[in-house]
């Protein structure tokens, strides 16, 4: 029978949901027709990892004509229950059978508010790219066949953060367009001119008189200026909840043994009554460990700690395989903005390459602020709920109990979000964490007196 989509009758050769390597291999194999990925990069939930890897392949092979993301918008329907309006999906209307949240797979939510991964797509798709050569000269590459770079204002600025100096380059519209106004940033890039100098580990001493309690590898109590600053212990913690991609790939089943940390040693050095140096070592005792969801520690702070300032990648959420659009900078925001509220709750809020991080009460109170400084880049997530609340698989944000504490994860590294499909493909190997090699990291905790 005749099918207009059959390769025999089509002017294009098309495939669906390849990995970047599979896309490259298919393009090399197909020698008679242009290749397109009719659908790729399934944007469901916390997704769109490894997006740059796709376009490294596409730009390197002129026989690849392009690819189409699935999808643009989450197809949720506004619904109100008990005075709370939320985005409903399959099963919220008594419909059986249903596809649950499988239609919640866009770059923007139903109200067209961008998800964090929207900005990664915007960055990778930008028509101009900027390259810096060994002499410091910036080269502009125009990938748009119909728009000359002269239509943009190219500007740059340098920003210094301590020892680190970065150059930001922007291409802005010179005039209003039907789709954006004058000054809209069409393309941007960041170059590190002078890298950040992470501090050296201090000489260890125990002269401080901090009121602390330590149980094994866990710091269980810390009283600062008469206040207990911990609502839950600072402890080694290698588990993380799933996102939609990981749920479909049985991530929790494959990594379940990491709900209990093994082969870890933590050293706490009291510098003074407000400052503690934390060093963690993981040394595997066997060679058959599965990948690790994350390598790091967690703690719980008072629920009043809802104002955040940090120096790292942002301002939006980013993960190791989805961080190119998130530039280094100092960002200030409330906890509610630091979190990402996905329509179906899942792992969220990570920030990569954090140099320092501060969190404390919004108003001026007697409660001290916590400052964290890494001796290497950190990954940090913060929520006003716990991992167990996400592991319980709530259907909607209002199903999560909030306001009991602030949950803070301070990590060396975290598993990437993935971004090929949401029915079994796994995160690319370079964005996973090998459970069979050692890890060491360190950070300083300092509870600053309020000014």
Where are these regions (language model features)?
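Substrate-binding/catalytic cleft of secreted carbohydrate-active enzymes
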Residues: 1-107
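Aromatic-rich peripheral "rim/lid" segments of glycoside hydrolase catalytic domains that contact
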Residues: 75-141, 179-197
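Short, hydrophobic/aromatic beta-strand segments
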Residues: 147-154, 181, 288-296
């Amino acid at each position: 029978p005749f099918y207009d989509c059959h390769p025999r009758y089509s002017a294009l050769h098309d495939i669906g949901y390849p990995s970047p390597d599979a896309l490259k291999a298919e393009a090399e194999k197909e020698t008679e027709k242009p290749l397109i990925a009719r659908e790729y990069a399934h944007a469901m939930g916390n997704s769109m990892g490894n997006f740059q890897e796709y376009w490294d392949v596409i730009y390197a092979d002129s026989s690849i004509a392009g690819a189409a993301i699935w999808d643009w918008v989450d197809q949720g329907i506004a619904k109100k229950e008990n005075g709370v309006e939320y985005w409903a999906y399959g099963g919220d209307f008594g419909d059986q059978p249903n596809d649950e949240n499988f239609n919640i797979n866009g770059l923007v939510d139903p109200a067209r508010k961008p998800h964090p991964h929207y900005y990664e797509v915007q960055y990778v798709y930008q028509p101009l790219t900027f390259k810096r050569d060994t002499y410091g000269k910036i080269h502009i590459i125009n990938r748009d066949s119909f728009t000359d770079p002269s239509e943009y204002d190219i500007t740059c600025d340098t920003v210094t953060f301590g020892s680190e100096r970065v150059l930001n380059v922007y291409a802005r519209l010179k005039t209003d367009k039907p789709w954006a106004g004058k000054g809209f940033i069409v393309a941007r890039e960041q170059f590190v001119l002078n890298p950040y100098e992470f501090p050296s580990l201090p000489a260890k001493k125990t002269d401080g008189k901090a009121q602390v309690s330590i149980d094994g590898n866990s710091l269980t109590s810390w009283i600062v200026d008469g206040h207990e600053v911990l609502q839950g212990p600072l402890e080694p913690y290698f588990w993380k909840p799933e996102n939609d991609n990981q749920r479909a790939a049985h991530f929790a089943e494959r990594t379940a043994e990491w709900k209990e940390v093994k082969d870890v040693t933590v050293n706490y050095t009291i510098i003074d009554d407000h400052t503690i140096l934390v060093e963690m070592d993981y040394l595997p005792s066997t060679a058959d460990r599965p990948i690790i969801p994350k390598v790091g520690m967690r703690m719980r702070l008072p629920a009043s700690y809802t104002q955040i300032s940090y120096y790292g990648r942002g301002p939006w959420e980013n993960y190791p395989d989805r961080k190119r659009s998130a530039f280094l900078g100092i960002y200030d925001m409330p906890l509610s903005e630091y979190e990402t509220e996905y329509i179906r709750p899942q792992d969220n809020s990570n920030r990569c390459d954090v140099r320092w991080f501060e969190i404390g009460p919004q108003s001026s109170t007697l409660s001290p602020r916590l400052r964290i400084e890494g001796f290497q880049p950190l990954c940090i997530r913060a929520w006003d709920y716990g991992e167990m609340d996400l592991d319980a698989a709530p259907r909607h944000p209002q199903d999560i109990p909030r306001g009991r504490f602030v949950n803070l994860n301070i990590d060396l590294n975290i598993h990437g979000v993935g971004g090929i499909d949401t029915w079994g493909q796994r995160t690319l190997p370079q964005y996973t964490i090998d459970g069979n090699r050692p890890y060491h990291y360190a950070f300083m905790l300092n509870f600053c007196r309020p000014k």
